Amino acid sequence: MIASFYAFLDYLKNMKAASPHTLRNYSIDLSSLKCFLEKKGELTPTPPLSLQEDSRSSSQLSFSLFTKENIRLYLLEQIQTTHSKRTVRRRLSAIKSFAKFCVKNQWIPENPAEMIRGPRLPKELPSPLTYEQVLALMSAPDLDKVTGFRDRCLLELFYSSGLRISEITALNRSDIDFQSNLLRICGKGKKERIVPMTKVAVQWLQAYLDHPDRAAVEQDHQACFLNRFGKRLSTRSIDRKFQQYLLKTGLSGTITPHTIRHTIATHWLERGMDLKTIQLLLGHTSLETTTIYTHVSMKLKKQIHDEAHPHNLED
């Protein structure tokens, strides 16, 4: 069975063009399942699944343990060990995709996870930042350092073009058209789209790329954004710096780089941009995904209405 895990990860990488972030999540989720099944079958534990071909281990794990009952027990254990409902749902989704792949390859007769439902999540709308909060966040990086210059540029691009964090890290210098103020973005499934940049974002991007301290450490000559060692910046590094800036500005709540993507989409809608254009800019495959911002916009309008209405101001 261990070989099927690796075949699935290779399939995601080579055939589905999954991002490194997605591959890492699948590897973590399936490693967790593997560990549970090994324990259930009283087998010798093996290392987590590796994305590196030269460090992959073998196991005596059999498909006979990959049953509906064991999957249910695994999910129950996940819930009881304080994993969030969102994480458990993600892991179930990974298991279903893996099982479907195994059925397609005729390794198992049917998908044991097909009819299993994950824990329900409360319906949550993304909470966008205000324009003032966006400005506060952008002012947080220390511009005396090239890394601060880089981070200001990152924040400008997040808000300018509504990019995903994986799209930012994958950005190459050759993807930038300074004459037209456009970016060529490689999105999910390696689907390309062209997005515009604001003049402010262009100025910060040009200034960062021309920064002498950036040139002094540059090792990856293709990557747009570099870490302090001159190599391509990772999504983890961006997440870590982002959390530091949230603390510095005093912003609270569940705020991530993806929040800025939600924020600019909401701001575009509130300023009259049509949903189809927002869909194209964000790289959504389905317009249905984009319509969530109409609910966010209405929620904000209702909040403003309730706070400003004279009847609500009475004692």
Swiss-Prot record:
It comes from the Bacteria. Transmembrane segments: none annotated. Keywords: Cell cycle, Cell division, Chromosome partition, Cytoplasm, DNA integration, DNA recombination, DNA-binding. It is found in: Cytoplasm. GO terms for molecular function: DNA binding; tyrosine-based site-specific recombinase activity. CDD domains: INT_XerDC_C. Residues 124-306 form the Tyr recombinase domain. The keyword Oxidoreductase does not apply. One of its GO terms (cellular component) is cytoplasm. InterPro entries: CB, DNA_brk_join_enz, Integrase-like_cat_sf, Integrase_catalytic, Integrase_recombinase_N, Integrase_SAM-like_N, Recomb_XerC, Tyrosine_recombinase_XerC/XerD. One of its GO terms (biological process) is cell division. Residues 1-103 form the Core-binding (CB) domain. The active site is at R164, K188, H258, R261, H284, Y293 (o-(3'-phospho-dna)-tyrosine intermediate). Its main location: cytoplasm. Forms a cyclic heterotetrameric complex composed of two molecules of XerC and two molecules of XerD. Belongs to the 'phage' integrase family. XerC subfamily. Site-specific tyrosine recombinase, which acts by catalyzing the cutting and rejoining of the recombining DNA molecules. The XerC-XerD complex is essential to convert dimers of the bacterial chromosome into monomers to permit their segregation at cell division. It also contributes to the segregational stability of plasmids. This is Tyrosine recombinase XerC. It comes from Chlamydia muridarum (strain MoPn / Nigg).
